[in-house]
Regions:
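Class I (Rossmann-like) S-adenosyl-L-methionine-dependent methyltransferase catalytic domain
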Residues: 33, 39, 46-57, 73-149, ...
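Class I SAM-dependent methyltransferase core
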Residues: 155
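A short acidic, Gly/Pro-enriched loop at the edge of an enzyme's catalytic core
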Residues: 207-217
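A short SAM/SAH-binding and catalytic strip from SAM-dependent methyltransferases
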Residues: 216-229
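A short glycine-rich, Lys/Arg-flanked "PGG" loop and its adjoining helix->strand segment in the class I
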Residues: 232-244
Length: 335
C-alpha cells in the first residue's frame, strides 16, 4: 500500500527477492537443485521463509506487526483454497481457539529456546498452523485421496492441536488426535471442541481406533522423534488403522537438519549405518527434545524408503531445503 504501513516491508521483500532471483533461476543453480531432488519453487519458498525470519528479528516492531498480519492473511487464504480444491466448494473456516500457553508450545515445536517468544505470538502461531493444514490437504489430494463428508482423520502426536483444529472445517469429519503428554491432551480437550483427544503410550497400539477406519493419518514432527527400535511397530499400527486407499502423511528429518545439527563424526556414522539418534541429554539435540527428554532421529533416504516401504506405497518423498522432509504414502486399495 502506498503511503501505508505495509510499504516498507513490501519494498524490503521486493529488493531481497530481486537480489535472489537471478541466482535462483540460473542454469548452474538448477543443476544443483536437480542433484538434490528439490524444485525451484521449493527453493523460492525456503528463501522467502528465511527472509521472513530475518525480518522478524531485525525490523522495527511496527514492520514486524505488518509482516505477521500479511502472513496470517495469506495463510488463511491458502487454507480456504485448499479446502475448496479438496471438497469442490467453499466452506467456512472454524475459529481456531486460544493460543496454547508457552510451556506447551515449547514442548512440541522449538529448535532453540530463543524461538519461543516469536512462536508464542498469536499471528505467528496461527499463520504457521493454517499453512501446515493447507499443505497437508493439498499433498493428500495430489496423492489421490478423495475428500468427502464424514471422512475420518487421525493425527498421531498432535501436540497442542494446532493442526487438527483447522480440519474441523471438513463437513461432519470424525477427527481423532493423540499425544503422549497428558497435560497437553487435557488442554486440548478443554480448548478445542469437536475433536476426540486421547493419550497414547510411547509404544502402540492405539486401541481407540478400529482397523481400516481412517482415511487420512498425520504424523507431523513425530517420526522425527520416535526411536528407530520402535518405528516398525508404529508403522505397522498406522497401516492397521488406515483403510485401503487411505493416505499417511508424515515428516522426517532431512538434509537441512542433518547439516545444522550433526557434526562431521555424526554425519559419518549416519552415512555408514543409515541411522543416527540424539537423545535429550545431548547438547546438539533440539530444544523441545531436551525439554521433554525425547530423541532426534536421523535416517538416510535408502533406510527411509526401506522401512516405510514395508507398509506403504510412497507416493511422494518431498525434500525440503529449509525444514523437515515429507512423506506422502498410501495403503494400496483392495483388488
Amino acid at each position: 500500500m502506498k503511503g501505508g504501513r505495509f510499504q516498507a516491508p513490501a519494498t524490503w521483500f521486493g529488493r531481497r527477492e530481486a537480489d535472489c532471483a537471478g541466482y535462483i533461476n540460473s542454469r548452474s543453480s538448477k543443476t544443483i537443485y536437480q542433484r538434490a531432488s528439490v524444485s525451484v519453487d521449493q527453493v523460492k519458498r525456503a528463501c522467502r521463509a528465511t527472509m521472513v525470519a530475518i525480518a522478524l528479528m531485525v525490523l522495527p516492531p511496527r514492520f514486524v506487526a505488518a509482516i505477521t498480519a500479511i502472513r496470517l492473511h495469506q495463510s488463511r487464504r491458502d487454507l480456504k483454497e485448499a479446502l475448496r480444491e479438496a471438497l469442490g466448494r467453499d466452506v467456512a473456516l472454524v475459529e481456531p481457539g486460544p493460543v496454547p500457553p508457552p510451556e506447551l508450545i515449547a514442548a512440541t515445536s522449538l529448535m532453540s529456546k530463543s524461538d519461543l517468544q516469536l512462536k508464542s505470538q498469536k499471528h505467528v502461531y496461527l499463520a504457521h498452523s493454517y499453512r501446515s493444514a493447507a499443505w497437508i490437504l493439498n499433498m493428500a489430494r495430489a496423492a489421490g485421496l478423495t475428500f468427502r463428508e464424514g471422512m475420518s482423520i487421525f493425527e498421531l502426536g498432535c501436540g497442542e492441536g494446532r493442526l487438527i483444529s483447522h480440519l474441523r472445517a471438513l463437513p461432519r469429519a470424525r477427527l481423532v488426535a493423540s499425544d503422549v503428554r497428558a497435560d497437553t491432551i487435557k488442554w486440548c480437550r478443554n480448548s478445542l471442541p469437536g475433536i476426540e483427544f486421547h493419550v497414547n503410550e510411547l509404544e502402540p497400539p492405539v486401541a481407540f481406533l478400529e482397523s481400516n477406519s481412517v482415511d487420512l493419518a498425520i504424523a507431523q514432527s513425530v517420526f522425527t522423534h520416535i526411536p528407530l527400535a520402535w518405528q516398525r511397530a508404529w508403522l505397522e499400527e498406522i497401516a492397521r488403522v488406515i483403510r485401503p486407499g487411505g493416505i499417511f502423511w508424515c515428516t522426517i528429518i532431512g538434509q537441512h537438519h542433518i547439516d545444522v545439527m550433526l557434526d562431521k563424526d555424526a554425519r559419518q556414522i549416519l552415512e555408514e549405518t543409515g541411522e543416527f539418534e540424539l537423545d535429550g541429554k545431548d547438547p546438539r539435540s533440539s530444544y523441545s527434545t531436551q525439554l521433554i527428554g525425547s530423541w532426534d532421529v536421523f535416517q538416510t533416504e535408502p533406510v527411509v524408503r526401506r522401512e516405510f516401504g514395508r507398509y506403504f506405497e510412497i507416493a511422494n518423498y518431498q525434500k525440503n531445503p529449509a525444514g523437515p522432509d515429507v512423506l506422502v504414502m498410501r495403503v494400496p486399495p483392495l483388488g
